[in-house]
Swiss-Prot record:
NCBIfam families: PRK13241.1 (NF009712), urease_gam (TIGR00193). PANTHER family: UREASE. Its EC number is 3.5.1.5. Pathway: Nitrogen metabolism; urea degradation; CO(2) and NH(3) from urea (urease route): step 1/1. The gene is ureA. It catalyses: urea + 2 H2O + H(+) = hydrogencarbonate + 2 NH4(+). It holds the Pfam family Urease_gamma. It is an enzyme of class 3 (hydrolase). This is Urease subunit gamma. Its main location: cytoplasm. It is found in: Cytoplasm.
Length: 100
């Protein structure tokens, strides 16, 4: 199976998000890469489901709370930008202050 670099990146994000999801379910607080991966994967999946950019920008702020992440992580993440594939093409989704 041949994958493009973009497809490999998507799989890497998905794998990291899956790990983050499992750790969150166990009650573990997420670190920086896990938090970014979980938010990014949720945005990409939402785009695949047909949500709009505006909906995903709002949705991105509901995925994690300060209680879900290690101390200081919320302050480190000011924006998350994800190139997501929508039915009408690829668009950049920016989620400002995603962890509230």
């Amino acid at each position: 199976m041949e994958l493009s670099p973009r497809e490999k990146d998507k799989l890497l994000i998905f794998t990291a998000a899956l790990l983050a999801e499992r750790r969150k379910e166990k009650g573990l607080k997420l670190n920086y890469p896990e938090s970014i991966a979980l938010i990014s994967a949720a945005i990409m999946e939402g785009a695949r489901e047909g949500k709009t950019v505006a909906e995903l920008m709002d949705f991105g702020r509901t995925i994690l709370s300060r209680d879900d992440v290690m101390e200081g992580i919320a302050e480190m993440i000011h924006d998350v930008q994800v190139e997501a594939t929508f039915p009408d093409g690829t668009k950049l989704v920016t989620v400002h202050e995603p962890i509230v």
